[in-house]
Every structure is written in C-alpha cells, then in structure tokens.
Amino acid sequence: MDLLYIVAALVIFASLLIAKSKRKPKKNLPPGPPRLPIIGNLHQLGEKPHRAMVELSKTYGPLMSLKLGSVTTVVATSVETVRDVLKTYDLECCSRPYMTYPARITYNLKDLVFSPYDKYWRQVRKLTVVELYTAKRVQSFRHIREEEVASFVRFNKQAASSEETVNLSQKILKMSGSVICRIGFGINLEGSKLENTYQEIIVQAFEVLGSLAAVDYFPVIGTIIDRITGLHAKCEKVFHGIDSFFDQAIQRHIDDPSIKDDIIDLLLKMERGEGSLGEYELTREHTKGILMNILTAGIDTSAQTMTWAMTHLLANPRVMKKLQAEIREKIKNIDEITDDDVEQLDYFKLVLKETFRISPIVPVLVPRVAAKDLKIAGYDVPEKTWIHVNMWAVHMSPSIWKDPETFNPERFIDNQTDFKGLNFELLPFGSGRRMCPGMGMGLAVVHLTLINLLYRFDWKLPNGMKAEELSIEENYGLICVKKLPLEAIPVLTQWT
C-alpha cells in the first residue's frame, strides 16, 4: 500500500512538472546550425574559429547560437549585435565565464582580463586607470621606450651593413618584451630567468589562454582529454615559468629599495598598506595576477601590431613608399619624437587604422557571460549563456568596408571612424567596461618603433621574394599572430 502511495505521488508530481513546462513560454533563441551529440558544434569551428563563425553567420544570421560541448553560446558578428553586447547591454554582459586554465595562470582570477565583474574587478580596474596607465605615467617611461628602440635601431643598422636578413617577428617581440620588463618590473630581460625562454613562454601563454580547453566544455572527461593533448602540462609549464620570473623581480625590489617608480614598486607599496584597493587587502597573489596581464598583454599585443603593420607595408610597396615619404618630410628631429610629431603624420595614422582593421590582434574578444535573461536583436539570450563577440567579422564586413580583404589606408581619408571604443565598426581595443586600459601605453611603443624603422631604413624581402608572394596568413588564438615569421632585410639610407 505504501508503494502505491509513493507511485501515485510521483505520477502527480510528474504531471505537475509537465503541465508547468507546457505553460512556460518557449524561448525565441537565436538560430544556429544542427549540432552533434556530445560535441555540439565544436567540429565546425576548425583551426580558425573567427573565419568559421563568419561563414556560419551567412546562413544563421548576425546573432547565432552554437553549442560547444556542454556550453551554450551565442556569437555576435554584425556591428549592430556587437553594439548591443558592448554598449546597450554592457553591464549585463561584461562578466566572464569561469575558464580553468586562465584561472590557473592568473592566480585564480586575481587579474583584470579574466576575472568576473564584481567589486574586486572594479577596484583593480580603477587601480589600472588611475595609477598604472595614466598619461603622466606613460610619459614617465618615455626614456625606457627611447633606449630600447635605439638599441633595436642599432641592431638593424648592423644587419643592414652586412645585408643580413632579420626575423622581425622575433626581434620585435624581444624589443617589446624588454620595454615591458623594464617598465613593469624594473628588470632587464637579459639576465633574468625569462631571458632564454620568454618568447616560448609568452607564445605558449597565449596558446593556453586562447585554447578551447576540453575541461571547460566537457566537465566529466575534459581533464583527461587535456592531459592527453598536453594542454594541461603546457599550462603548468607556463605558470611556473612566469611565476619564477615574478618571484625574481619582486625579490629584487625587496632586496634593493632604491628600485622605484615602476609598477612592481607601486603594487608592493599597496601590499604594505601604503595604498588602497577598496575593501580588499592586496596580497602577493593579487600582485602577481595583475602583473600577469601586464606581462602577457603588454608584450605580445604591441609586438603583433608592429609585426602586422610591417607585413602589410612590405606586401604593399606603394603604401610603404608613401608612408616613408611623409615621415621623412615631416619629422624634423628623429631623436626627439613627441606626441605632437605623431599628430602631424596623417598618413601614418591611416596606416595604423587599416592595420587594426584588417589584422585585429584579438579577432574574437574574450568570452562574456549573460548575467540575466536578455533580449538581443529580437532573440532571447538566457542567463549564463556565453557570448562571443567576433570583431574580425565586423572589420571584414563588405557591408561596412569596400573590398575588405584589400589593405587600403586611403579608405579612412574621408572616414572619421576611430579605434578608441566609440565606433563599433573598428574596435581593436574593445569597448565599454572591458575596454583595454593599456591602449595608451601600447600605442606609445608602437608609434615610436614603427616611425624609427620606417624613417631610418628602407626594407626589402629576402631571397628575391616579390611583395605579392609574402604570406599574410594568420594563426588563431587569443591573439592573432602571423603564421610564418616575418623576415626582411633593412637597407641603409641617408637617414640611418
């Protein structure tokens, strides 16, 4: 008899659930491609997800649904849907989903890029804007930028004297790393624990941070898959390599109090209670988490911007000659380049905009997560849905840009579109609350380096390679890097 009561109760309970589900209005989710069991749509992303998403959007629209393993996602690929995510619903969409390996590398999300939108994030954001990346602080590091660029120029002068081919991808990354290490850590890259491995570590860090980690999409077996593929081991190698470098740099500051006025000095003062992070007490892990963003984002994003700019210039000799003519005519004292000098280089600014457009360093922004149920472009986006913003799709949209695959700086002559977060047709640094706070610092390095390389040297491709033969293919990751290293030969000029 007791069993009958239990069965009857279960039947009634099930009936109520079914009735409730029938009364619940069906959500109008964004359309998307059919999915396979278990893996969903992962197989459709391929090696270049930013391009695959664009192809899928041609069928399923500018806001589409994808199922990536167990994760429900939507992808925004038009300027209208991107504006909705980054502006209209910025507050509701500015948090981050939990991602295992970024959490590991950032000391359990004690950074700015991957941490969720909460009180801690707001305090760290305030710290970076008010203390770390102010115009005054950017200017205070000018001598470091000038010294490292001068060293880079001397290297290229020696190479030019012997007509030696330079691996610009590698050398630009090293120069950028030297600038960031001195600005952020008060330490020369040469002689540090990262001297011989930093390029490998930085590249692998971005591979880990930008990977589709199985552990995040397949909770039950993902860890096993990542151990088999080597992603877990790569993450641990990256973490311990950079952590050891941080320990060295921090200990150097502790042992020598005369090292002042860099970013570690500021953070150590806050650890000692000489500053404020709101209600949070800054610990050593907080310091390292913040430094992680500075090391990785600061080095590689600037380096890749310069590498792509030189790539497109070498592939387009007409643009290269026109830009060099402007720089050599308008720069009166190359040894004293100022922000005012950059302002008068109108064509240089067009070239930089076109580089950001055609080769966005972050093609798909770091995933966001919906904080509540939203209505975007007429579709329902449920709470906890991951949101991918495909900026490459917008930058390469033929409805916005004529001949988008062509490198053409002149397209911006009568186009006032800027890249500082207000024009959603061009967002190399993002927009809204999650916009990159280090834009000014990065641009200062990019401006000074490119102007010197183009003013002082002519450039030619090695082995008789023609401009049209230069590969501009990219590798996908958290940042978009050139698939093949950029190699070129500097040529001495009267300005060298």
From Swiss-Prot:
Disulfide pattern: none
InterPro entries given in the database record: Cyt_P450 (IPR001128), Cyt_P450_CS (IPR017972), Cyt_P450_E_grp-I (IPR002401), Cyt_P450_sf (IPR036396)
One example GO MF annotation: monooxygenase activity
The protein's required cofactors: heme
EC number: 1.14.-.-
Keyword tags: Heme, Iron, Metal-binding, Monooxygenase, Oxidoreductase
Binding site residues for heme: 436
Protein name, per record: Cytochrome P450 71B1
Protein's organism: Thlaspi arvense
Originating gene: CYP71B1
